[in-house]
Amino acid sequence: MTEYTPMIKQYLEIKDKYQDAFLFFRLGDFYEMFFEDALNASQILEITLTGREGGTKEKIPMCGVPYHSASGYIDTLIEKGYKVAICEQVEDPKTTKGMVKREVVQLISPGTVMDERGLKAKENNYIASLYCYEGKEYGFAYSDLSTGELKSTVIEASEDRLINELTTLSTRELIVSSSEKEVLSDVMKEQLGLTFSVHEEDTIPVENEKLVTRHMSLSEKRAIGKLLHYLKETQKRDLGHLQQAVHYETSNYMKMDYYSKRNLELAESIRGKGRQGTLLWLLDNTQTAMGGRMLKQWIDRPLIDRKKIIDRQNDVSELMAHFFERLELVENLKNVYDLERLAGRVAYGNVNARDLIQLRNSLYQIPRIRATLLSMSSESLTELANQLDPCEELTEKLEEAIMDSAPISIREGGIIKDGYNSQLDTYRDASRNGKTWIAELERKERELTGIKTMKVGFNRVFGYYIEVTRANTHLLPEGRYERKQTLTNAERYITPELKEKEKLILDAEEKSMELEYQLFSEVREMVKDYIERLQKLAKSVSEIDCLQSFADISEKNHFIRPTLSEDGSLHVKQGRHPVVEKVMGAQSYVANDCVLDENREILLITGPNMSGKSTYMRQVALTAICAQVGCFVPAEEAILPIFDQIFTRIGAADDLIAGQSTFMVEMLEARNAIVHATKDSLILFDEIGRGTATYDGMALAQAIIEYIHENVHAKTLFSTHYHELTDLEKELSGLQNIHVSAVEENGKVVFLHKIKEGPADKSYGIHVAELAELPKSLIERASRILEQLENDDKKIIIASVKQPEEVHEEVQLSMFPVEPEKKASSKETKLLKEIASMNIMQMTPMDAMNKLYELQSKIH
């Protein structure tokens, strides 16, 4: 058996308890990693792998990072989904005989990050837990440890429902029992890209019982208990900033599944995976980090409560009507710090003096914000204003105690104001007077010795000294100057008087810094008493920030206040896609009407590719979402129903990880909509059935339309290239044909992007290919084939080098005819390769439009 050294034994004993984490093992000024941790970390962090003697024949793999710069390395590991266990020395090496005791003081995981550098200001960092009750329901709880938010609910024991909750929250980590983890599919684990943590204990810790209310179900309490136990065991510190668990019902909000949110690009773009080009990007003019986080929550969960929607609309109207007051509000909000996350750091003991200065400056703004809101006539804004707690006693205490110029470090003094503590003032006076005496000493010694270059200095190693150049040492009186340090060109001395004063000064400074740290710690502890009040204040300020953002964006983009219909009808005049309009510019964008009511439940949309069908469908959904989050909408007039759910199938979001084809995903999403939609839902289906054979696809598309019409009665926009389906208008009373218009000018197609009544009369597919600059010979051949297909009952035409009139009917399409007179140029070939490499199925209409402009610019 291998006999390791005592230190390696200690490492292995601790590592055994944290098998799923990198163990940062403190040795002096470094965090060291050994064995497999070292091998993996050296590659991930790109740091040098070395070895250390550990009692074995060969050196043990080792790598390390300096403790003072470890946070950057920790952030890298966390961002990649790993966990890091911080193991510190918990005994003083100077007073300990033998091996210094070490313990893990914190486990940092993707869901438990508290360091500001590892968090995104306008994004929550959620950790969730799951409790499966008899296979029937899931108790579900989640928290943002950095803000103290804690919420819970009960959902159906369905993987789809669970995925919807997890993706809505952008959850970073999920806590499950070992048996629950086994039940969840591997596909789900890979798709979600979150960290799974196994934890069995699920009873509420005694000290946290006050966070749970009695009316919560057993499964909900168990989910909360599992979450709290995990946080308690991994954080190993006070979690007093966690708020009382708030129960929420998913039925109180508009439901959208993961694919619908992705297709509509609410908070993340399909192509760039960022905020740019999303609805959140457009609507976000929040001035505070916490306001930005609340705005995302609002967009993720639109309201279905009519009164709450109207209240928000009233607030936005009021803010729009008071332009100058709104400007003043914005200026005040700019100076409000992230109160939510500050409260979390106070609980953790991580705040510094600068944080407290920012807290004080934030609290200064609250009376001003309150006064501005009270000057308006909105009842709900008045209610919000009255909820603003300026925490006057805290503001006064911070004003009295903390210097405006306080440093970040809390151990080096310069934090507490003069006059705050009499003993501190005494120490400071002693230090200042001593330094004045030393400055005077330098003048006296120069006069006494006649050495004009003599100076009195100080360093941390030797303390105070008198420095004389070598050339002048002979001028010093004998017996009074004691040599302290020899330099290349000078000698440093000390005198009895200087030695005595040095002790007084250094003692005073040491005591001053010790007392100052103690006083700062007392102030920091005092702030803990205000955590709950600060969290409530943060919530009110965040809501105000979101409302002013809606007002600002609505005004700048010419949005109007929508009316909520009572009969479920939708009437939008000159509606626009808010994001596309922003990117293209209002002058370039073509607005369109949309009407859906009991006589027009289904709009069947035909028209060529690139004409704007998908954009039109998306704009209807985004208009509804804007209305139900309480914002104004991009239109000239709008009467909108309150939708309980939105389902979309737009574009080809192939589920490659699950091994499902485009068509299978299409059918699964269609089923999801058909089974769960109600008469109050909105369904957007873009070219359903295109992933299979023509007649199969057409048959399925027709059957789906008929089923929605006869059984579901949801408001539906259904785009298709199956022109035959337009005949359904004669059979289905609630279906209306509309099309995106286009015209031919000089043999070229011009897309008007205008929605008109009735079916499209032509496809223009070949014209789209021509716009993409496909070779001329290819376009001409396609035109001849199309002409024959249209004239010959759509039979397949064999390729031939003969003229069209000499071609006979065949059932197999062969090679294109050879046209020696015209070969593709190198420029055409290059463009063809670029077009061929494009992943069209992953492009949004806006992406495709931008790419087309880019290709055109290369030609011209």
From Swiss-Prot:
Role summary: This protein is involved in the repair of mismatches in DNA. It is possible that it carries out the mismatch recognition step. This protein has a weak ATPase activity.
Protein family according to the UniProt entry: Belongs to the DNA mismatch repair MutS family.
Organism: Listeria monocytogenes serotype 4b (strain CLIP80459)
Nucleotide-binding as UniProt keyword: yes
PROSITE patterns: DNA_MISMATCH_REPAIR_2
Record-level Gene Ontology MF annotations: ATP binding; ATP-dependent DNA damage sensor activity; damaged DNA binding; mismatched DNA binding
Keywords: ATP-binding, DNA damage, DNA repair, DNA-binding, Nucleotide-binding
Biological process annotations from GO: mismatch repair
HAMAP family in the cross-refs: MutS
SMART domains per the UniProt record, alphabetical: MUTSac (SM00534), MUTSd (SM00533)
A GO CC term assigned to this protein in UniProt: cytosol
Binding-site list for ATP: 607-614
NCBIfam families in alphabetical order: mutS1, PRK05399.1
A matching Pfam family: MutS_II
Protein name: DNA mismatch repair protein MutS
